[in-house]
Amino acid sequence: MGRDTISNILTSIRNADMNKKETVRIPSTNIIESIVRILLREGFIENVRKHQENNKNFLVSTLRHRRNRTGTYRNILKRISRPGLRIYSNSQRIPRILGGMGIVILSTSRGIMTDREARLEGIGGEILCSIW
């Protein structure tokens, strides 16, 4: 049985968010780095830095906090395509989350990108997760 690394990072971020942690440490792979880069660019996390410990690479992500409040933003992270049930979509059928307010992360032939980028380029792919 293999590990589902995408579900692991989504669960780590969700658990850190619920426990009001400021940072979360995630094992680093190429796919994970691409997803975290998208989350950083879209504003769901505040900062990311690479960390190496015992010859293993990690990403330390700082979660985004509300101004003048103690809690973090409540992000809903949902895994759509999983190892037991892959979900693919063409460019016309990529789902919109909350009318375009949320994002869908896809794995395409041109790399990992958001639903907006995939629609602009006119390509589809595997729907990895949704965030709103």
UniProtKB/Swiss-Prot annotation:
GO terms of molecular function: rRNA binding; structural constituent of ribosome
Domain of life: Eukaryota
PROSITE patterns, alphabetized: RIBOSOMAL_S8
Source organism (scientific name): Ceratophyllum demersum (Rigid hornwort)
Protein name: Small ribosomal subunit protein uS8c
General function of this protein: One of the primary rRNA binding proteins, it binds directly to 16S rRNA central domain where it helps coordinate assembly of the platform of the 30S subunit.
A GO cellular-component term linked to this record: chloroplast
Keywords: Chloroplast, Plastid, Ribonucleoprotein, Ribosomal protein, RNA-binding, rRNA-binding
Presence of the UniProt keyword Ribonucleoprotein in the record: yes
GO BP, sorted A to Z: translation
PANTHER family per the UniProt record, alphabetical: 40S RIBOSOMAL PROTEIN S15A
Compartments (UniProt record): Plastid, Chloroplast
InterPro entries named in the record: Ribosomal_uS8, Ribosomal_uS8_CS, Ribosomal_uS8_sf
Annotated SUPFAM superfamilies: Ribosomal protein S8
Subunit annotation: Part of the 30S ribosomal subunit.
Family assignment from sequence similarity: Belongs to the universal ribosomal protein uS8 family.
